[in-house]
Amino acid sequence: MLVPKRVKHRREFRGKMRGEAKGGKEVSFGEYGLQATTSHWITNRQIEAARIAMTRYMKRGGKVWIKIFPHKSYTAKAIGVRMGSGKGAPEGWVAPVKRGKVMFEIAGVSEEIAREALRLASHKLPVKCKFVKREAE
C-alpha cells in the first residue's frame, strides 16, 4: 500500500479543493488513461483496490502507472470520545484529486482491454471518471 516514508507534520489541515487540477491533465506515460471528472479524496486502499482490479483483468500484461500518491494524512477520534480535547490521531492517508487529473495510465494492451480494465478500476474510486487516450503529437 502507498504511504509516505516520512512527513514533516503528522496532522494536516483538510484544505480546500476548488477548481481544476493544475497539471497532470494529459496522458503522458501510457497510451490510455483514467481521468477524474469530479474532485475528491482518494485513500491509499482505494488506489490499491483499483490497481489490483486493473492488473487482474489485464492478466499481468501491459504496464500500469499510478499518477497519484496519498501524501495527506487524515485524522479520526476514537468511537465514543466526546468533542474537544484536541485533534484525533492520524487514521490513514489520502490523495486529494481535483477534476481533470489523470490518475492511472495503461500501455501495452489493446484499447478494448484498457477500456474495460479502467472501467473496473473506476468502480473502486469515489470520483466520476472518464476514459482518455493519448493525443497524437
Swiss-Prot record:
Coiled coil: none annotated. Gene3D superfamilies: Ribosomal protein L10e/L16. Keywords: Ribonucleoprotein, Ribosomal protein, RNA-binding, rRNA-binding, tRNA-binding. One of its GO terms (biological process) is translation. The keyword Disulfide bond does not apply. One of its GO terms (cellular component) is cytosolic large ribosomal subunit. InterPro entries: Ribosomal_uL16, Ribosomal_uL16_bact-type, Ribosomal_uL16_CS, Ribosomal_uL16_dom, Ribosomal_uL16_sf. Pfam families: Ribosomal_L16. One of its GO terms (molecular function) is structural constituent of ribosome. Part of the 50S ribosomal subunit. Binds 23S rRNA and is also seen to make contacts with the A and possibly P site tRNAs. Belongs to the universal ribosomal protein uL16 family. This is Large ribosomal subunit protein uL16. It comes from Streptococcus pyogenes serotype M1.
